[in-house]
Amino acid sequence: MRTQSLYQPHFGHGSYTTRNVAKNTDIGKENGLISELVYNERQPAVAQLLLPLLLQLGKQSRWLLWLTPQQKLSKQWLQQSGLPVDKMVQLSQISPVNTVEAMEKALQTGNYSVVLGWLPELTEEDRLKLRRAAELGNAYGFIMRPQRDISPTHGHCSTLKIHSSLYH
């Protein structure tokens, strides 16, 4: 899994620990944030990293939006994870191009504390649009991207891999 902030200055204001996230139920009200998560679908690390943040964001009065063009969320998983099912909104069966536009519009509204979108590779212009929309709506936007298998012929990619065997 590789995470990459698309808005570096946000993290330049000091360390933001998990304790701070747990104490602050107004996450996303100070600044918007766009971050890209590249992950391996066979390893649960992304869910384990994102779930505490999503649980905290679920305490806000705003919605949590999932833009999933290819798949449908499992209601059973949502309930088991403790996420507020009544605050979840999912848009599926939309084209990847429309997903970028939908994510931008959703972030701008301020109606969502977080928008998770499974998007294709983005241009710098698209990233900038999403960052501005997140700032305007004071929301988190997570660009979710399953990891493509990296072939040795393409060289070494600088990524952090968290293996599921490290978790009990």
Curated annotation (Swiss-Prot):
<dbReference type="InterPro" id="IPR027417">
    <property type="entry name" value="P-loop_NTPase"/>
</dbReference>
<dbReference type="GO" id="GO:0009432">
    <property type="term" value="P:SOS response"/>
</dbReference>
<comment type="subunit">
    <text>Interacts with FtsZ.</text>
</comment>
<dbReference type="InterPro" id="IPR050356">
    <property type="entry name" value="SulA_CellDiv_inhibitor"/>
</dbReference>
<dbReference type="InterPro" id="IPR047696">
    <property type="entry name" value="SulA_enterobact"/>
</dbReference>
<feature type="region of interest" description="Lon protease binding">
    <location>
        <begin position="161"/>
        <end position="168"/>
    </location>
</feature>
<comment type="similarity">
    <text>Belongs to the SulA family.</text>
</comment>
<keyword id="KW-0227">DNA damage</keyword>
<dbReference type="Pfam" id="PF03846">
    <property type="entry name" value="SulA"/>
</dbReference>
<comment type="function">
    <text>Component of the SOS system and an inhibitor of cell division. Accumulation of SulA causes rapid cessation of cell division and the appearance of long, non-septate filaments. In the presence of GTP, binds a polymerization-competent form of FtsZ in a 1:1 ratio, thus inhibiting FtsZ polymerization and therefore preventing it from participating in the assembly of the Z ring. This mechanism prevents the premature segregation of damaged DNA to daughter cells during cell division.</text>
</comment>
<protein>
    <recommendedName>
        <fullName>Cell division inhibitor SulA</fullName>
    </recommendedName>
</protein>
<keyword id="KW-0717">Septation</keyword>
<feature type="site" description="Essential for degradation by Lon protease">
    <location>
        <position position="168"/>
    </location>
</feature>
<feature type="region of interest" description="FtsZ binding">
    <location>
        <begin position="106"/>
        <end position="112"/>
    </location>
</feature>
<dbReference type="GO" id="GO:0006281">
    <property type="term" value="P:DNA repair"/>
</dbReference>
<dbReference type="GO" id="GO:0000917">
    <property type="term" value="P:division septum assembly"/>
</dbReference>
<dbReference type="InterPro" id="IPR004596">
    <property type="entry name" value="Cell_div_suppressor_SulA"/>
</dbReference>
<keyword id="KW-0132">Cell division</keyword>
<dbReference type="GO" id="GO:0051782">
    <property type="term" value="P:negative regulation of cell division"/>
</dbReference>
<keyword id="KW-0131">Cell cycle</keyword>
<keyword id="KW-0742">SOS response</keyword>
